[in-house]
Curated annotation (Swiss-Prot):
GO terms for cellular component: plasma membrane. Transmembrane segments: none annotated. Its EC number is 7.4.2.11. It is an enzyme of class 7 (translocase). The gene is metN. Belongs to the ABC transporter superfamily. Methionine importer (TC 3.A.1.24) family. Residues 29-270 form the ABC transporter domain. PANTHER family: AMINO ACID IMPORT ATP-BINDING PROTEIN, METHIONINE IMPORT ATP-BINDING PROTEIN METN. Disulfide bonds: none annotated. This is Methionine import ATP-binding protein MetN. PROSITE patterns: ABC_TRANSPORTER_1, ABC_TRANSPORTER_2, METN.
Amino acid sequence: MNEIAMNAPWPPHAGATTALASLQPTTGIRIEGVRKVYAARKSSAEVVALDGINLHVPKGSIQGVIGRSGAGKSTLIRLVNGLDKPSEGKVFVNDVEITSLSEPELRQARRSIGMVFQHFNLLSSRTAFGNVALPLEIAGTPKTEIEKRVLPLLDMVGLADKRDRYPAELSGGQKQRVGIARALATEPSVLLSDEATSALDPETTDQILDLLKQINRDLHLTILFITHEMAVVKALADRVAVIEGGRIVEEGSTFDVFATPRHEVTRRFVSSVTGSGAPDWLLAQPHEPPGGKAVLRITFKGSDANQPLLSHIARTLDIDINILSGQVEMIADHPFGTLIVSLTPSPDILRQVIAKLSTNNNLVEQLGYVA
């Protein structure tokens, strides 16, 4: 990146978007009607990567975007940090329309946007200190100021004692911590994360997610991250958008999306971490076998996840209810439980059980039968 361009007068001309002078943005990221189409090549038709994306990320919140490979997640991140432009629509960061900026304006605007990469993108010839200092050097920051900025960042990510280590001497988790510190060097108000934990082991992933939550709390950063892992969404996000085929098919608070997934893609993601999916052996018996039992899946939300509703119903109706599988966990600080149970398939009994369980917005589904 050209240092002269980085230090060009700001704004470069009197008519340049005065929105950039907004000191108190009301929103972190706003995406309006975005469509991204890649032109056709000789051997293939045009590719619609994003189609009608609308997303609002409140300032200071953590927004997850989850989708399978090829769903459009990475394209979305590229549009937010200005590495690419949409075919249609607008992208705003801190109330500034990124999509309308000139190159000098965009370079300046990117200083308020930090980026954390999947594969760290560290320079092997630079120490941890040198990698974190790099964006400040490019921006022409004085050396004395660089040291004042970098050392607290290394301390924040737990690497104060690794300042002189090279990437080859660091673990994967430590490399990502350097990457996070580097992303914070220019004191951004928005942090973008592109699959930041997918190359890490489970324990290190948890540590990095805890670090991102701490940074969000302490620095009041707006965080937008993309992932293909619902466990990451569950651990980190305030809100989540599910993207499929370039469209957002579901969006809401993390708890609501987990508790009541509406789209089939969302249900598959949720069942991968909550155990709420029906096992294959059960789906193979959609009809009642002789002497069989009906199988119900019950999703408990909020305080009901900790209540003895099943035992109360079993006593009241004088029936046996067998628990086949289940778990209770915390999602976005709310209890959430899923149980798969079997019971006598009498229509009258089933009707009463479902009616009693369906109170307080619990979700009850009949999945099939077991012998």
